[in-house]
Amino acid sequence: MSGARRGNGVRLRKGKLIPRDDGKRIEEFVGAATTSTDSASVARMLAPPGWSEPAQRPEFDEVVIVLTGELTIVVEGRRERISAGEVGLVPRGKRVVYRNDGQGACDYWSVCAPAFRPELAHMETPKPRVQENHVTIQVAHGQGRDFARLLTTWARAYLVQLELSGVELSLSLVDDRAIRRLNRTWRKKDKATDVLSFPAGDLPKGTPGPRPLGDVVISLDTAKRQAKEYGRTLESEMARYLAHGLLHLLGHDHERPRDAKRMAALEEQLLGERGMVADSLQVDAKARRARSLM
């Protein structure tokens, strides 16, 4: 068809194949009108299932002719489906997204007037896709099921606040007997405690799926006891344990003053109030003042 002249005075020339790394093949034909009309471009496109183009607000009118399959066009938030044999028109200046929501490939033609040029398409930069976080919980306490959903909700919220994505977090809600056994086995401390953290090892690069952070184990018995002792609600007490344990999984600790202040600030960010490390720092400060008065 290259160089062929039609009776209407439009010359079409065959364009080169334009490779795309999103799996969409474009064979482009550009026609320039020899009369007083604006130049136009004609492109044949094959869009695979699941394909989507970034939003754009073009300075040209575009006519879409679907040959096979189905094309979804979202114009100013309104979705239209163009099936085989149908034609769609997108006026210039409208925000539009093209995508293929069907099961098979969509073969269609696009006619733009004036001719398509990237600088006239005003294509938006797509936002990076945020990978979903996965939170699982095991309940090994007779009364723990009432709090399982609450802990899971908090955990997801904490991960978002910490700007983490594509990670997996495991939670366990146990009694004092179980957490004492874990504390004795892994920390050589034969007593119950409030929360334990077990970081996951590093996976080989390229391993598919979410990145595991590790396990946070919370004692519901200790939470009940300490909530009553310090005048806090049980929910508040467990939220403190969860925030504390999660930060330990991420490598934070409170051994040195500078690290403790950093961890205390992060706990307060997650909880909206003072956390376990801040309380510990306050106790230490009071002890130092008491010793100085002796």
Swiss-Prot record:
Pfam families: Cupin_2, YbeY
Keyword entries, A-Z: Cytoplasm, Endonuclease, Hydrolase, Metal-binding, Nuclease, Ribosome biogenesis, rRNA processing, Zinc
Cofactor note: Binds 1 zinc ion.
InterPro entries: Cupin_2, MetalPrtase_cat_dom_sf_prd, RmlC-like_jellyroll, RmlC_Cupin_sf, YbeY, YbeY_CS
The keyword Ligase is assigned to this record: no
Cofactor: Zn(2+)
This enzyme's EC code(s): 3.1.-.-
Keyword hit for Cytoplasm: yes
Localization, UniProt: Cytoplasm
A Gene Ontology term for the protein's cellular component: cytoplasm
Residue numbers binding Zn(2+): H244, H248, H254
Residue ranges of coiled coil: none
Residue span of region Endoribonuclease YbeY: 123-294
Occurrences of domain Cupin type-2 (ranges): 45-111
A GO molecular-function descriptor: zinc ion binding
BP terms from Gene Ontology: rRNA processing
Predominant location category: cytoplasm
Record-stated family: Belongs to the endoribonuclease YbeY family.
Function: Single strand-specific metallo-endoribonuclease involved in late-stage 70S ribosome quality control and in maturation of the 3' terminus of the 16S rRNA.
HAMAP family in the record: Endoribonucl_YbeY (MF_00009)
PANTHER family xref list: ENDORIBONUCLEASE YBEY, CHLOROPLASTIC (PTHR46986:SF1)
Cited NCBIfam families: rRNA maturation RNase YbeY
The protein, known as: Endoribonuclease YbeY
The species this protein was found in: Myxococcus xanthus (strain DK1622)
Gene expressing this chain: ybeY
